[in-house]
Amino acid sequence: MKRISLIGGTGSIGVQTCDVIEQHPDLFELEAYAFGTNVEVATEWINRLRPKYVSATSIEVLEQLKPRLTYEPLYFIGPEGLKECATAERADIVVTAVVGAVGLEPTLAAIQAGKDIALANKETLVTAGHLVKAAVKEHGVNLLPVDSEHSAIYQCLNGERREDVSKIILTASGGSFRDRSRDELADVTVEDALNHPNWSMGAKITIDSATMFNKGLEVIEAHWLFDIDYNDIEVILHRESIIHSMVEFKDAAVMAQLGNPDMRGPILYALSGPKRLEIEGNKRLNLKEIGKLHFEEADFNRYPALRLAFEAGRAGGSMPTVLNAANEVAVDLFLNGQITFLEIERLVEDAMARHEVIAEPTLAQILEVDRAVRQQIQQGIEGGE
């Protein structure tokens, strides 16, 4: 029996993780469950899976939750609650499904407590890859990818020698606006952006997919997960989202992992791999029905977010933290109708241009850079810049 702590239980990855746990009660048990403000979704899964520890973002949210539960777990709140759930004594593995840089501290706490990590929170590696990798090595835990692209690479590398890898190829759907020109993006709405052609995801990651910042963050994540140089990471557009990513080896052989878009597959593989388990309702891939798969260049002129991500990754140090923080604030501003879609990229590029890189930032410095970037952008918007 593998006991699981889930950080970010009400989002898309969190809900699908709960589904996977419920489908395999003989193998998995939910030990701790942390969520933000979605009491309705939290109530359903907490009552169904009955974790020992429950954490919410605030006391107000917790007070809404308590009368809805059919039993009495141990309650926690806020950032400390995330850490309590991440370090729950009996937990074997922590699924970090929370969105944004808020996932960094509980992830580090879990590693220091000797927990394996099923990483769906890409911002953790983007902002503090050097700290996370050092902690993983020091405490001897496993860092397992949940993102479909990184799970695909992880599976392709099973049994292979790292020195035989020539490059990795991340596939990207192109997002909601893949068939629109740059000029046509000037007036797109939030509703347009949230209509992803292939995946069912949360609002933030759906916007990131439309800008391609999501793929950019995945480039930086891949650099840390697989110890690969940025020059050996390629991004290509693949509109069907059937090939989740590929690995090219030095003999020119290419291995790819295919499947219908369903995040429960990567989640389950992170929890059970290399053993493979069935997933109820997982549609089998029928290539005869699909007929054709398409691939295109991911043009940096069409997708400046990709260029910015590679630049931030190569700059290293604190620059990826700036990229991530600026993007998180900009996406929130767009979702709230305060800026246009194309201004997301501009705000990120401006923040990076202002920043003086700290080469080997401490956790405290990362958190301070994150805070300062967010504050600066918010003040600029309020001041009418």
Curated annotation (Swiss-Prot):
Family: Belongs to the DXR family.
Regions that span the bilayer: none
Disulfide cross-links: none
Alphabetical list of NCBIfam families matching this protein: Dxr (TIGR00243), PRK12464.1 (NF009114)
Cofactor: Mg(2+); Mn(2+)
Keywords from the named record: Isoprene biosynthesis, Manganese, Metal-binding, NADP, Oxidoreductase
Originating species: Exiguobacterium sp. (strain ATCC BAA-1283 / AT1b)
Binding site for Mn(2+): 147, 149, 218
Binding site for 1-deoxy-D-xylulose 5-phosphate: 122, 148-149, 173, 196, 209, 214-215, 218
Protein name per Swiss-Prot or TrEMBL: 1-deoxy-D-xylulose 5-phosphate reductoisomerase
GO molecular function, one term: NADPH binding
Protein's UniProt keywords contain Ligase: no
EC number annotated for this UniProt entry: 1.1.1.267
Keyword NADP part of the UniProt annotation: yes
Purpose: Catalyzes the NADPH-dependent rearrangement and reduction of 1-deoxy-D-xylulose-5-phosphate (DXP) to 2-C-methyl-D-erythritol 4-phosphate (MEP).
Catalysed reactions, as listed in the record: 2-C-methyl-D-erythritol 4-phosphate + NADP(+) = 1-deoxy-D-xylulose 5-phosphate + NADPH + H(+)
Binding site for NADPH: 10-13, 36, 38, 121, 123, 202
